[in-house]
Amino acid sequence: MTIDLAPHLDLDGCVTHLRDLIRIPSVNPPEAAPDAAAGRDPRGGETAAARYCAAVLDGAGIETEVIEVTTPGRGSVFGRLRATGPATEPPLMLLSHIDVVPVDAESWSRDPFGGDLVDGVVWGRGAVDMKDMVAMELAVMLALKRSGVELRRDVIFAAVADEEAGGTHGARGLVDARPELFADADGRPAAAAINEVGGYSVTVGSRRFYTIQVAEKGIVWTRLRATGTPGHGSMPHDDNATIKLAAAVTALAEDQARRPARVVPAVRGFLATLGLDEVARLAETDPVAASAALNAAIPEPVLRRSIDAMLRDTATPTVLHAGKKVNVIAGSGEAEVDVRTLPGTDQEALLDHLQEVVGSNALVEPVISLPAVEWPDNAEIVGLMTDALRAADPDGTPATMMITPGTDAKALMDLGIPCYGFAPLRLEADVPFLSLFHGHDERVPVSALAFGLPVLAEVVARYAARP
């Protein structure tokens, strides 16, 4: 039996929901929102976004629940279409997050919370990370409801808070406090979740590829703490915490440049699909030649950096704090370091190595540690994603991959739920898509949504509907 949701999909409604959600400044942390919110109330932004989604689903007769699992204003929303009759299979989850990172509004060409639609492009914070997917998953839920299709499993919509800061107020907290939200009436956790950071197209040479995320790196957010002797800036001495911190950060950068590569299976398969077998072959034995081969094959710098980061553990200093006054030698200083680990890396051993690298200049302290995760790339739902992409774009090639960021998939792994990154978008080769994540002038073409919405709906219908 063929299930066709296309007649029930509302692209205009999807775009409207995206624009409306962008106009809700659900910035994480909330206190980072006021200046950028252009007079709009920034408090409770995530709960406001959750209530918006709940109202859309409630209006269609879909049961919903808004939950503030830890703190007022840090809300998430769950919606559920129940199986028609007894569920024969565990649920499918449509997972997204409604929080967004802060903006530097002065660096934007348009109001980052305006949701402007200009020349077929929607602008605003969250347009690609990831309110576009929230809107598409809302549209799919509405289409399932309108169609009256019989479901063999529950379909759960989950748009959660706090993904951008580890999920304590969102997925992580909900998994711990309300695991039943991720399961059916028989207590079976979801068989799969469709999540972010995959599905989009990348162009390599003259070929177009569609990514399907089947793994993601681990996270160890780390603090460097340097201490010294405070004093007057006019009388320098050798125990300056600022100098120690700078030396520690410099040592980390030099160590990163020497860090060896390790090609994990998900990355080896991705490189093979892209025709970059030579990069995979050389990465572990001749890094200079591997780098040259990668540079020659991938001229686009952000994609090239992404692939390079797939090949090794990384430690990136991102935040520095030292000193409060120009004429005072700091007695302490801190740096924040974003450490990302490949599947199979011993995170404690890597931290020990980083401590050796910085030596006595600073103390290395882990703040948040989350493991790398991997899922089978031959799962039924991956096959459905591949089939739907090939049908929609016969000239494109699906490619399973590992991503370097982290997602709420790490929290759901505690329940045994595999999360596949699949927010399908067909993008022109000149769209700097990867650089728009957390970047200025975040935006998404409506044409990309027009491609992706029926592809996503096809996967959901084939996986969830009764045959």
Residue locations for each model-derived region?
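Acidic, glycine-rich active-site loops and adjacent beta-strand->loop/helix elements
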Residues: 72, 98-100, 158-167, 196-201, ...
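Active-site metal-coordination/substrate-binding segment of hydrolases
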Residues: 88-159
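N-terminal helical capping/dimerization or prosegment-like subdomains
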Residues: 2-104, 332-336, 347-348
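Zn-dependent metallopeptidase/amidohydrolase metal-coordination segment
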Residues: 371, 395-466
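Acidic-enriched catalytic cores of C-N bond-cleaving enzymes acting on peptides and small amides
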Residues: 183-192, 198-207, 212-221, 233-320, ...
